[in-house]
C-alpha cells in the first residue's frame, strides 16, 4: 500500500501525537509499505526518511491557520490518489482520521464552566473554527473510519457528532517496552541523587507541558493536605515554573517540589518515582500514563481522561473524579503510601503486566487491519 499520513508536524521533538506519527511511518515502512507524510513542518534529521509533501498555510490567525491546513492537506491527499490517507488530527476528505486532539466542543465545556463565559468563548474565531472543522470531518461520508484512543473519546464523538457506531474504532496507544520497562528502577537512587531528592522519601511524578490543565495546582494542594508530610513531587516538562513554585511556597511545601524541566530520559525519572499523578481536565489518552505503568509506576488520574481506561483502582493506581478533586487526590496519596512495601511492589508488577498487553506492535497491527478494511471498501465501491 501507498499510505499518506497527514500531520501538521512530523517530529520527535514535539508532543506525543507527533512522535506517534513518526513511529507509524517507520513501522509501516518496515512492513514494506510506501509512506508519504503530508504536513507543515518536518525535523531536519527526518527529511531523508519519508517523502514529505509540504502544506502551505495561512498563519495570519489561529483560525485561518487551522482551516487552511485542513483544506490544503486534504487537497494534496486527493490529488495524489494514495491507497490510504490517514489524518492524525483535523484534516478534510481523508479515508480515516484519528482523534488525537481534544474535542473542542467538549473541551469548551470543561475549560469554561461558567455558562456565560462558555457562550462568549464559542464566538471566539479559533474555537468556532475548530468546532466547525470537527463537525465537517466527523460527518463527512467520505471518511470511512473515525479512530479514537479511548472509550471516553469514542463516547464523546458519538455524543457531539453522532458518528455511526460502524464507523468508529478504538485503537489504544502503544508503548515501546524496549524503552519503557521496569529495569529503569535500578537507577532509582542515582536519578534521585542527580535531582537532589532523598533516596527514601515518597515521590510523586508529574509530566506535562500544561501545568494548569493537567492539575498541578490541585496536586500541590493535595500534597500539602496529605498526612504523609515527607511526600515530594518531581515536575517534568516546561511551564510557568515561578508561578507554581510560589504556590508551593505559599502552601508550605516549596522545598518538597522539584522542577526538572523537559527531560530526554523521562523513563529514568519514572523509575525514580513511587506514583505517577496526572489528573487532567480532559485528555483523549495521555501516553505518559502508559509509559509510567510500563516502568512499574502506578498511576493516579481523573475519570475525565481517556487514560482512566487502563487504571484499576487499588490494583494499578487510583482514580479521582476531576482535575479539581483535591480531597480525593489527598485520600489517594494517603491510601497509596499507607500500603505496605510488598503491596506497592505487587501493584508495580500489575502495572508492568498491563502495559505489556499494550505494546506499540498491537497498535500497528490494529491500524494495518483498519487500512485493509478501508481499502477493501474503496475497491468494492
Predicted regions mapped to residue ranges:
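A conserved mid-protein helix/loop that constitutes part of the nucleotide-sugar donor-binding site
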Residues: 19-23, 202-225, 242
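Membrane-proximal helix-turn-helix segments that form the acceptor-binding/catalytic region
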Residues: 125-149, 155
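Carbohydrate-associated surface elements
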Residues: 152, 174
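A short helix/loop element that forms part of the nucleotide-sugar donor recognition site in Leloir-type
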Residues: 181-197
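A short, well-ordered alpha-helix in the C-terminal region of glycosyltransferases
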Residues: 193, 342-357, 369
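Aromatic "clamp/platform" in nucleotide-sugar-dependent glycosyltransferases that forms part
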Residues: 262, 281
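Short hydrophobic beta-strand element within catalytic cores of glycosyltransferases
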Residues: 298-301, 311
